[in-house]
Amino acid sequence: MLVAALLTLCAPSGALAAVNTIVLQSSPITIGPFGVARGIQRVDSPSVDGNVVSMSADVVDLAGNPVPNAHVMLHHVVFVKVLHPDYTCSTFTGYDGLPSPLPVERFYAEGEEHMSLGLPNGYGYPNKGSDIWGLVYMLMNHHNSADTVRVRYTVRYATGESLRPVTPVWLDMRNCQADPIFSVPGTGGSGSSYEQHTDFTMPESGSFIAGGAHLHGGGLQLELTDRSWGGRLFTSLPTWGGEMPTPMMHEPGPVQMTTFSTAPGLPVRRGDTLRLSAQYDNSAPHTRVMGIMILYFSPGSVDGLSPSSIPLTGAPQRPPYMRLPLLRRPRGPLARNIRSTAVGDYVFGNQRVSIPRGTTFTWRFVGAEQHDVTLASGPVGFASPSLQRGSYRHRFTRPGTYRLFCSLHPTLMTQIVTVR
């Protein structure tokens, strides 16, 4: 099928209209035992002009066989078009914390919920054969041995026909970052919720004709509203209960998020203020979470169109409570009343710490690789960015036992901070 599709794509420009399925793969990605691989690489793209009408991704071994989620988890992948400006970001910060030297447009993403792109008939995401695609990835290896895999992506590609062009619109609680995380404190009590939101003003009129969303463990819903007329546009709800990878290296996310694909879509007008709200359970901490919605926008006049919304498909479900264990017991003497520790490669300098309530504690990053400080369990949720140099501070205002780890090296780097 792949060979036939490629031959069709290489046909002369006068060829009949066709929609072909193209299967492509990333370069090999090696992940250490119980490790996390993050990075950015250039990937292949269709070699002739056309339109992407659908897209999906998965993880395969070097022989092309699908890899189970319980073995290597596709935590998330983002496909970008290099040298194209993004609709909501003027600059993009990579995993290294540095701004991208080139503009990139985020046009498709997939996480644990395995969202696939499917545009309505008559619409397409324009692509030139000369366009450059990139892949931003985060994969997790749940086995005690190194593994090498590829990200496989399947593109349905229309050529030889004129489709209405769509523009990807990425909305995010922490926009313009490769790792757009925040943490839920978990201090609200039983049945409580925690919400963050972000606003974006539309620079032009048109309609959203497709969209999907990405939440992490503890998520309740992502809701898009148009504050200019006060109405709801789309609510994406999670489904829980998938296969549980072991060991549990992070709080499991939903196995599905509701999406929409419809024409003529959801009309919005130039100057409208869109608000994306991410709602999480606040009865327990949830760290390194995200709140993202990617929409596909068809610009044009919406005169005469009334506001509309995607019907709700249910109500938010309370996510299952998952207590994240420490995968390595912290070692060494108990360090009392200290205010800082070094974080080197694969080790916290002081792994067992006891401090009085109200202490502001500092982690100093001094390794050759990136690491972070993330709460596994404890009274209040927090997490640092991934850092190679610099420091991170947290003020401990609630007594209790804080079990901490590095989310990039969860079986190697752990720490317990007891707050008196």
Please state what every model-predicted region is.
Residues S13-A17:
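Sec/Tat signal peptide C-region and signal peptidase I cleavage site
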Residues A18-S207, G212-L326:
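Beta-strand-centric surfaces of beta-sandwich/beta-rich domains
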Residues A4, V53, V78-K81, G381, ...:
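N-terminal non-cleavable signal-anchor helices
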Residues L7, S45, V67, Y123, ...:
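Generic marker of residues within folded, mature protein domains
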Residues M1-A11:
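Bacterial N-terminal signal peptides
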Residues L326-R420:
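Extracytoplasmic copper-binding redox domains, predominantly the cupredoxin/blue-copper superfamily
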